[in-house]
Curated annotation (Swiss-Prot):
Stored NCBIfam families: clpP (TIGR00493), PRK00277.1 (NF001368), PRK12553.1 (NF009205)
Record-given protein name: ATP-dependent Clp protease proteolytic subunit
Lineage, uppermost ranks: Bacteria, Pseudomonadati, Spirochaetota, Spirochaetia, Spirochaetales
EC number of the protein: 3.4.21.92
Spans through the membrane: none
Key word Protease present: yes
GO cellular component, one term: endopeptidase Clp complex
């Protein structure tokens, strides 16, 4: 049964006398939807960036929808996605489904202002960057300084994106800071909670 987890669902589209089969992610991409699920790493970031650039080339005036269900991951991979979101012309709407933790929360907050959303029972978590450090004392010092630099960068960007004072944000990020969708709305991480009308 393990092989079942590796299957990607397909969608059959009927057009006239023809049928076309799409994997579900390609079909969503036609609707300008990108789905970022799981750990954020370099290969996943490359895929998301390619999709963002492709959708911009298709229509630079229509919003792109980035659905997030992620426990977080690599800071550098997340920053690459963030930079691309800010670089392209279309607004990127971010929608949390399930969870947006750590770098996932950072990307959720990076959506276009007024277009950052969450489903009702999603959870959002922010915290400071962390990393395992080993090696010689000089290497440990270099790595520690880099983690502190990245922490300051993340706080600066998030503070600007969500309008929370840097000192408060730094204090809240000292430990895992979990929020419901309602908490995230009050905090400024999202702009709307999506409910069925």
């Amino acid at each position: 049964m393990e092989f079942m987890h590796n299957l990607i669902p397909t969608v059959i589209e009927h057009t006239g006398n023809y049928e076309r089969v799409f994997d579900i992610y390609s079909r969503l991409l036609r609707e300008r939807i990108i789905f970022l699920s799981g750990e954020i790493n370099d290969p996943k970031a490359d895929t998301v960036i390619a999709q963002l650039l492709f959708l911009e080339s298709e229509d630079s005036n229509k919003d792109i929808y980035l659905y997030l269900n992620s426990p977080g991951g690599s800071i550098t991979a997340g920053l690459a996605i963030y930079d691309t979101m800010q670089y392209i012309k279309p607004d990127v709407r971010t929608i949390c489904i399930g969870q947006a933790a750590s770098m996932g929360a950072f990307l959720l907050a990076a959506g276009a202002k007024g277009k950052r959303e969450s489903l009702t029972y999603s959870r959002i978590m922010i915290h400071q960057p962390w990393g395992g450090i080993s090696g010689q004392a000089s290497d440990i010092n270099i790595q520690a300084n880099e983690i502190l630099r990245l922490k300051k960068l993340i706080i600066d960007i998030m503070s600007n994106q969500i309008g929370v004072d840097k000192e408060k944000l730094a204090l809240d990020m000292e430990r895992d800071y979990f929020m419901t969708s309602s908490d995230a709305l009050k905090y400024g991480l999202i702009d709307n909670i999506l409910v069925r009308e």
